[in-house]
A protein has these predicted regions:
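N-terminal helix-turn-helix
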Residues: 1-76
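A structural signal for short hydrophobic beta-strand segments in well-ordered beta-sheet cores
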Residues: 52-53, 100-101, 207
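Short, flexible active-site loops
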Residues: 158-168
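Extended hydrophobic
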Residues: 169-210
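Amphipathic alpha-helical effector-binding/dimerization core
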Residues: 61-160
Length: 210
């Protein structure tokens, strides 16, 4: 596969996000700028190899092969070995959703919380987070716990982009969030109250590297 073709394949796969899990061919073309004939050909190849799946409404979504590859990543393997027993123990004690997230993103401006493990609680309020999903750092408990571990240089770069409101309770003011990060470092855990999902609260603790 040539570098040019590989680049186009990656651009197509990158189109799919948590907010846009399924796309039409036209939407893929608009997002990538790839010529229609090339887009049709590449999409057909991706479907043949289970990297994309064609839905009944002539839309496409990520295929099972991507999930299978993701499960083989060193991160996923380490998570299953080291963290899953602890996630299950928390779930058994609380009956609530239990998540494990890591900091992900090439730069502080692009950083987010990547959920790499989840146990769903039978008594808990549904949330938008899922294994493999990404949520903003400033609006989630796990995100705030991760932010609290960053140094000042990293935080200055992170705060150079606006903090968007996910709900009316989301903290979007830098000074307010910085004060909360100081409190998190002092007490050792982070909290949120309806900042990402209405009706939901969370408690998060930063962990040593697995």
């Amino acid at each position: 596969m040539s570098r040019g073709l590989l680049g186009r394949v990656l651009r197509i796969l990158d189109c799919f996000t948590e907010d846009n899990p399924s796309l039409s061919v036209q939407e893929i073309i608009e997002r990538t700028g790839i010529a229609r004939s090339s887009a049709h050909r590449i999409i057909a190849e991706l479907v043949d190899h289970d990297l994309l799946v064609r839905l009944p409404n002539h839309r496409y979504s990520i295929g099972v092969r991507m999930w299978e590859w993701g499960e083989l990543s060193p991160l996923s393997l380490r998570i299953r070995e080291a963290a899953l027993p602890h996630l299950m123990r928390l779930y058994e004690v609380t009956g609530e959703n239990v998540h494990l997230a890591v900091l992900n993103g090439k730069t502080p401006q692009q950083a987010h919380a990547l959920f790499v493990g989840r146990v769903t609680g039978f008594m808990s309020i549904p949330t938008v987070s899922r294994a493999g999903g990404r949520d903003p750092l400033h609006a989630t408990g796990v995100g705030k716990a991760l932010l609290a571990g960053r140094n000042e240089t990293w935080l200055e770069e992170y705060f150079s982009t606006p903090l968007l409101a996910e709900t009316q309770h989301t903290i979007t003011d830098e000074e307010t969030l910085r004060k909360e990060l100081v409190e998190i470092r002092h007490r050792g855990y982070a909290t949120t109250r309806e900042e990402m999902t209405l009706g939901n609260i969370s408690v998060a603790v930063p962990l040593p590297r697995i």
